[in-house]
Structures are given as structure tokens and as C-alpha cells.
């Protein structure tokens, strides 16, 4: 593996364990790869325990348990118990589907610290349509059970063109449920969301109206419910510091053991991300070519190389650059300084046109195989 000067590198602090790609829902904005149904076997319980131990020894302290739907793993409580023994702060990121009071109590006993529940819409018909599964009533029960079992209620609603008109109702639903935290996560366009972008990207006017409603409501519930509004990249003129900088803070392990600097990095060609089945976490973090590829600033092209903002945003998202320009070393096209910024503007302009002539692809194994066969 390619080497790096260890003394100059930070250690991973946040480990995202994508335990499985299995999921009973079929959300068309899912960030999982399009070809997920063709990927290899999931890591075993013992393999996950080894990964958690190695990452913790290296410095990781926050553990996200996601998927797919992590509740489909019957060994979830065992993994949580091991994480707790290692000293992680554990966060279950779930649709809530498959969670009941018995399982919540089991996870609580195992030492789980935090549960984040996603809801697609405050209205049953749209929620179940977007999820591809009748799940709305159960999600509401789960949200209440979570709080009854002593957890803070953390709701996440992914925002897009299909539900952005419901912003006021989303906020009222969260308030009525007694949510302690509400994350309004505007869709980021990777994986299935990019495939369905023409159906999902709101217009500029829709976004501005929804943001104003959210900001106003934030003042109304100040001290009672914290609202986090994640602005979509496409409506910024400067990119975010993706993952706080490539290979500096975040480490994702996919269900088949592939180690990723960010959860979408699997889409980058020629990156050759290593597997935890072949290398230790220490080797992957310090030695792998994939994790060293976009560290520091030497890889940058203009306009990033001479930009005074490069130490703030690190050139933006490598995956977004590749998906929109074909070159993962290009400046993130979200940036107004990028020579490819017009591609973001074109995507926004396309929201004014009807997307009815294009199918909406739901995230399921049949579509995964058909699209990548």
C-alpha cells in the first residue's frame, strides 16, 4: 500500500458502519450505490467486532450504525454491546421499520446511546408511496416508543421536490410528537438520488419558501426543539468541506467490508478502495492510496490550487466533481469559481420543466440489477 507520513495525519473520529444494504423500504433518494444488489457478502458479526476494535484503537469515538436498514441484522444488539464495551458513543440510524418496544429495550440494555428515526412525509399516503412500503403509522409509534424508553427523540426528514411543499406540516408533526431534534436534510445527489434528480430537485422558489418557514419555526420552538436545516449543495455558491476533508475525520465501512473516505466514494473509478478483509484499519487509514489520494492540497487543479478558500472547503466534494464533470480532481461544480458551475445551474433550470417523461426509479433489488446488468 502507498505510504503516508503518519505524524502529520489526524485520526478518524467518526466511524460509519453500514451494516447491510438490505432494507424493507425503497426510497428513491437513497444514497446506497445503484449496484448494491450485486455486491459481495456482508461482514460477519466477528468481522464487524474486529473492525470496531481496530477503529477504536486508532481513535474513533463516534459510531453510526446504518445501512440499508441496520435492524435487519439479527446481531445488532451484539454489535452494540461490543461497541459499548469499547467506549463508543453509538447512534442507530433507522427507518424504524422492524423496531418494536422489545427490540428497543434490548438495544437499550446493550448500551445504545442514540436512535435517529426517519420519516418520509407527515402525510400517510405520500410517506408510504415514497417508502414503497406501508410504514407511516408504525414510524409514528416508533418515534413515541423511543422517547418513552428514555432516548431523546431525533427525527430526520429528507427534503426534496415531492415533500418540500409540506414543510409547515413536517415541523408541526415533529413538534406534536415531542421531538427533541429535527434534521431537515435536503437531498444530496448521489446514488439513487442522482438517478432521480429530475423528480427530486426543488425549484429555487420552493427551496427559498421552505427555508423561510423552517427558520421562522426554529424561533417558535427555541428551547424546546432543535431544528437543523441542511442546505442542498446545488443552492450554494461555495462547496461544503466534504467529510471535513478527505481522510481526516470520517471513515465508512460498507456492508461487504470496503473502506471508504466517504459513503459515496465507491462511485469513483480507479480509486481501488481497500477492504477490511485484506487490511487492518490502521493500514487502510495511513497507508492506502485511496485514503491518501485527496489529502492535503497537492492533488488540486486550478482554480482550487491558488484559491484562498481551499483550506476552508478542501475543494468540495470529490464524488460530486466526478459525477458532474467526469474528473474527480476538478473543483466541485457547486462552486461559482468552477469552470463547470454551469452544470449545476443547468440542473436547477431543468427543475422548471416537467419530469413526467422520465420514470422514477425506486431503490430495490430488481431495479438495482436491471440498471447495472
Curated annotation (Swiss-Prot):
Pfam families: Fer4_12, Radical_SAM, SPASM
GO molecular function: 4 iron, 4 sulfur cluster binding; cyclase activity; iron ion binding; oxidoreductase activity; S-adenosyl-L-methionine binding
Pathway the protein acts in: Cofactor biosynthesis; pyrroloquinoline quinone biosynthesis
UniProt cross-references to HAMAP family, sorted A to Z: PqqE
Gene3D superfamilies found in the cross-reference section: Aldolase class I
Organism: Methylococcus capsulatus (strain ATCC 33009 / NCIMB 11132 / Bath)
Gene (name only): pqqE
Function: Catalyzes the cross-linking of a glutamate residue and a tyrosine residue in the PqqA protein as part of the biosynthesis of pyrroloquinoline quinone (PQQ).
Database matches in InterPro entries: 4Fe4S-binding_SPASM_dom, Aldolase_TIM, Elp3/MiaA/NifB-like_rSAM, MoaA_NifB_PqqE_Fe-S-bd_CS, PQQ_synth_PqqE_bac, PqqE-like, Radical_SAM_PqqE_MftC-like, rSAM
Cofactor: [4Fe-4S] cluster
EC code: 1.21.98.4
This protein's name: PqqA peptide cyclase
Top-level taxon of origin: Bacteria
Binding-site positions, [4Fe-4S] cluster: 23, 27, 30
Family label: Belongs to the radical SAM superfamily. PqqE family.
Keywords for the protein's UniProt record, in alphabetical order: 4Fe-4S, Iron, Iron-sulfur, Metal-binding, Oxidoreductase, PQQ biosynthesis, S-adenosyl-L-methionine
Domain Radical SAM core: 9-224
Stored NCBIfam families: PQQ_syn_pqqE, rSAM_more_4Fe4S
Signal peptide: none
Biological process, per Gene Ontology: pyrroloquinoline quinone biosynthetic process
Bound cofactor: record note: Binds 1 [4Fe-4S] cluster. The cluster is coordinated with 3 cysteines and an exchangeable S-adenosyl-L-methionine.
Catalysed reactions, as listed in the record: [PQQ precursor protein] + S-adenosyl-L-methionine = E-Y cross-linked-[PQQ precursor protein] + 5'-deoxyadenosine + L-methionine + H(+)
Quaternary assembly: Interacts with PqqD. The interaction is necessary for activity of PqqE.
Amino acid at each position: 500500500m502507498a505510504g503516508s507520513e503518519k505524524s502529520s495525519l489526524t485520526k478518524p473520529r467518526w466511524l460509519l458502519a453500514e451494516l447491510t444494504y438490505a432494507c424493507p423500504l425503497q426510497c428513491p433518494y437513497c444514497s446506497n450505490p445503484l449496484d448494491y444488489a450485486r455486491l459481495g457478502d456482508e461482514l460477519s458479526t466477528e468481522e464487524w467486532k474486529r473492525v470496531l476494535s481496530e477503529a477504536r484503537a486508532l481513535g474513533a469515538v463516534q459510531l453510526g450504525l446504518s445501512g440499508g436498514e441496520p435492524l435487519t441484522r439479527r446481531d445488532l444488539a451484539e454489535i452494540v454491546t461490543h461497541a459499548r464495551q469499547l467506549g463508543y458513543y453509538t447512534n442507530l440510524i433507522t427507518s424504524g421499520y422492524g423496531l418494536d418496544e422489545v427490540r428497543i429495550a434490548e438495544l437499550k440494555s446493550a448500551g445504545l446511546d442514540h436512535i435517529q428515526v426517519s420519516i418520509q412525509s407527515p402525510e400517510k399516503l405520500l410517506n408510504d408511496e415514497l417508502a414503497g412500503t406501508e410504514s407511516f403509522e408504525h414510524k409514528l409509534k416508533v418515534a413515541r416508543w423511543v422517547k418513552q424508553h428514555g432516548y431523546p427523540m431525533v427525527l430526520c426528514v429528507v427534503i426534496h421536490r415531492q415533500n418540500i411543499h409540506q414543510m409547515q406540516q413536517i415541523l408541526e408533526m415533529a413538534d406534536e410528537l415531542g421531538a427533541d431534534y429535527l434534521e431537515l436534510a435536503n437531498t444530496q445527489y448521489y446514488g439513487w438520488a442522482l438517478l432521480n434528480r429530475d423528480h427530486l430537485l426543488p425549484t429555487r422558489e420552493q427551496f427559498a419558501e421552505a427555508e423561510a418557514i423552517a427558520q421562522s419555526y426554529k424561533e417558535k420552538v427555541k428551547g424546546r426543539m432543535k431544528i437543523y436545516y441542511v442546505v442542498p449543495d446545488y443552492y450554494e455558491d461555495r462547496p461544503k468541506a466534504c467529510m471535513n476533508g478527505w481522510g481526516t475525520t470520517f471513515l465508512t465501512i460498507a456492508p461487504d467490508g470496503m473502506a471508504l473516505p466517504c459513503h459515496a466514494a465507491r462511485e469513483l473509478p480507479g480509486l481501488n478502495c481497500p477492504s477490511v478483509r485484506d487490511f487492518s484499519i490502521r493500514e487502510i487509514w495511513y497507508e492506502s492510496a485511496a485514503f491518501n489520494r485527496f489529502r492535503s492540497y497537492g492533488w488540486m487543479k486550478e482554480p482550487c490550487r491558488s484559491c484562498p478558500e481551499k483550506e476552508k472547503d478542501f475543494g468540495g466534494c470529490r464524488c460530486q466533481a466526478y459525477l458532474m464533470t467526469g474528473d474527480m480532481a476538478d473543483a466541485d461544480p457547486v462552486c461559482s469559481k468552477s469552470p463547470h458551475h454551469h452544470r449545476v445551474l443547468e440542473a436547477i433550470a431543468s427543475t422548471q420543466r416537467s419530469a413526467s417523461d422520465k420514470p422514477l426509479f425506486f431503490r430495490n433489488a430488481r431495479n438495482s440489477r436491471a440498471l447495472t446488468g
